[in-house]
UniProtKB/Swiss-Prot annotation:
The lineage of its organism: Bacteria, Pseudomonadati, Pseudomonadota, Gammaproteobacteria, Enterobacterales. Keywords: Ribonucleoprotein, Ribosomal protein, RNA-binding, rRNA-binding. This is Large ribosomal subunit protein uL2. It comes from Buchnera aphidicola subsp. Acyrthosiphon pisum (strain APS) (Acyrthosiphon pisum symbiotic bacterium). PROSITE patterns: RIBOSOMAL_L2. The keyword Ribosomal protein applies.
Length: 273
């Protein structure tokens, strides 16, 4: 994998930094694991904008990725790695010994032809999936479940991982990249190793049009708007003369937004500021 800085042959190329991976499959994705994916444009079922800065972008097909990894004690061979437009990490197409194919998140360090397996007593090897209670303390894992059997929810983006730091009766303690320490049931599953494509963070789009290709619309400053559009709008000059707020008048700097108090008891230490 190489990080390539483009030559400034035009203003749109001057700042572009690409991540080139020659291992990615150049053909079409596996058709049996594709589904139609429609765009919302950031609107809800009433047609109202609920998420700003979303719209347009290239058409995508959804790749069905196996986050549960619950096909136990059947070995699978890594056939190829593919680009997935719906996530920052790459995906791997694996072929089980019984002939079934599935997509999984491509872990860092595995190669085409490697064998991986899931199960209660799977070896501690990159790409294998097993319950947290059977994984040694200190191991880096990804695609970690929060509820047994629901499928991995933590550490799925490019280059991410969590570290297993302790066990306490029926719970395992995890240290997240953010610094948060949280508990989850020890019979939840996780995959050994880190998610691949960690160079994704070095990628620079380089121009506004590249953001439009991936469905991101412009972000306009509130102070550049009219008073009818934003609390910061209007007035002479650039000063808006009040504490910064959202377009709906809610404090925007430092205000806590977490509402899920039901799971607060599982968070031992909140993330670092």
């Amino acid at each position: 994998m190489a990080v390539v800085k483009c030559k400034p042959t035009s203003p749109g190329r001057r700042h572009v930094i690409k991540v080139v991976n020659n291992e990615l499959y150049k053909g079409k994705p596996y058709s049996l694991l594709l589904r139609k994916k429609s765009k919302s444009g950031g609107r809800n079922n009433n047609g109202r904008i609920t998420t700003r800065h979303i719209g347009g972008g290239h058409k995508r097909a959804y790749r069905i990725v196996d986050f549960k990894r619950n096909k136990d004690d059947i070995g699978a061979t890594v056939e190829r790695f593919e680009y997935d437009p719906n996530r920052s990490s790459n995906i791997a197409l694996i072929l089980y010994k019984d002939g079934e194919r599935k997509y999984i998140l491509a872990p860092k360090g595995i190669k085409i032809g490697d064998t991986i397996i899931s199960g209660l007593r799977a070896p501690i090897k990159t790409g294998n999936t097993l319950p947290l209670k059977n994984i040694p303390v200190g191991t880096f894992v990804h695609n970690v479940e929060l509820k047994p059997g629901k499928g991995g929810q933590i550490a799925r983006s490019a280059g991410s991982y969590v570290q297993l730091v302790a066990f306490d009766e029926e719970y395992a303690t995890l240290r997240l990249r953010s610094g948060e320490m949280r508990k989850t049931q020890s019979n939840c599953r996780a995959t050994i190793g880190e998610v691949g494509n960690s160079e994704h963070m070095l990628k620079v789009l380089g121009k506004a049009g590249a953001s439009r290709w991936i469905g991101i619309r412009p972000t306009v400053r509130g102070t550049a708007m009219n008073p009818v559009d934003h609390p910061h709008g209007g007035g002479e000059g650039r000063n808006f003369g009040k504490h910064p707020v959202t377009p709906w008048g809610i404090q925007t700097k430092g205000k806590k937004t977490r509402k899920n108090k039901r799971t607060d008891k599982f968070i031992l230490r909140h993330r670092r500021k």
